[in-house]
């Protein structure tokens, strides 16, 4: 299912984040696209063939839900919808691991149906038929999650019958931290709440699981001194309440930069009258905005503002 290009405009302009979460990511995957899978499954079964609509997901990770069927075989298997789509000839897994089609480039979400109906296969699209391997995705990724295209040791190769395809070995911990708003460079909301955090996602060694734990704990956390709802990250909680998810980075490298390069080089069919980029993309500095002095800056700033002069001679620094 296509992702409208306009759903990236708000984040690109730094003005509106909801559209990406709703129309590009969570609700496109969980509401709009499954309806197509359902209708297609019904169409197949109307013709006498069984159809199993498969929701793109991840396998259970705690390892305690069931015993393996046999040694070496995990008990809970979820298929990679991107690898299967590549094997079906729908497109190519780009270097950033985002799926690309000849019509829309990276602006697609995938569904999957298993069926006993025999279908004529499409030819597999080879690595590099769509992806330019230009490195734009890696250069523009705010989390430094995508390796250099020149690093042959950072590639994942998958065999699809007689054909092998490859893509970059993405650092999913860094990707998840950026995607879920734990990167000051691409989240004005984190920068507002934690202006001095200066957590360098680009060099983080966090695993994907650790990144998820940190992101969701922060997004759903509360703190008694926060006004109104006491939410640590007010916007993250707000958008999760409305959409059930929160996506903050807006795929700056893996989709936006990739899309722009594919459009400029006529690699994809969906054309536009105007270029996506018309000015340099914004980025926030990761360094602290203001390093406060004092024993307890929070308390001292509050007292100075509320009761001017009350702290006079409270304590003095000595050299």
Sequence positions of predicted segments:
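Generic low-polarity alpha-helical segments
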Residues: 1-2, 146, 317-319
């Amino acid at each position: 299912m296509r992702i409208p290009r306009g759903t990236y405009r708000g984040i690109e302009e730094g003005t509106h984040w909801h559209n990406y979460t709703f129309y590009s990511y969570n609700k496109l995957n969980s509401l709009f696209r499954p309806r197509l899978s359902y209708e297609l499954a019904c169409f197949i079964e109307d013709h006498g063939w069984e159809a199993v609509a498969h929701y793109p997901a991840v396998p259970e990770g705690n390892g305690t839900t069931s015993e393996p069927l046999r040694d070496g075989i995990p008990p809970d298997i979820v298929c990679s919808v991107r690898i299967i789509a590549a094997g079906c000839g729908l497109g190519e897994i780009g270097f950033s691991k985002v799926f690309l089609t000849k019509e829309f480039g990276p602006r697609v979400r995938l569904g999957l149906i298993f069926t006993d109906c025999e279908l004529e296969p499409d030819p597999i699209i080879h690595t590099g038929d769509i992806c330019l391997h230009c490195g734009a995705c890696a250069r523009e990724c705010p989390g430094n999650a995508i390796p250099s295209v020149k690093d042959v040791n950072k590639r994942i190769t998958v065999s699809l019958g007689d054909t092998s395809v490859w893509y970059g070995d993405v650092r999913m911990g860094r990707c998840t931290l950026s995607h879920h708003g734990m990167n000051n460079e691409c989240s004005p909301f984190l920068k507002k709440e934690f202006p001095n955090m200066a957590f360098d996602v680009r060099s983080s060694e966090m695993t994907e699981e650790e990144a998820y734990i940190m992101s969701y704990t922060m997004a759903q956390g509360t703190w008694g001194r926060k006004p109104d709802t006491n939410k640590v990250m007010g916007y993250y909680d707000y958008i999760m309440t409305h959409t059930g998810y929160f996506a903050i980075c807006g795929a700056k490298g893996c989709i936006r930069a990739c899309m722009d390069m594919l459009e400029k080089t006529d690699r994809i069919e969906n054309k536009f009258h105007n270029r996506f980029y018309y000015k340099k993309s914004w980025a926030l500095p990761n360094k602290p905005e203001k390093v406060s002095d004092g024993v307890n800056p929070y308390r001292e700033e509050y007292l100075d503002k509320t009761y001017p002069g009350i702290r006079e001679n409270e304590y003095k620094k000595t050299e």
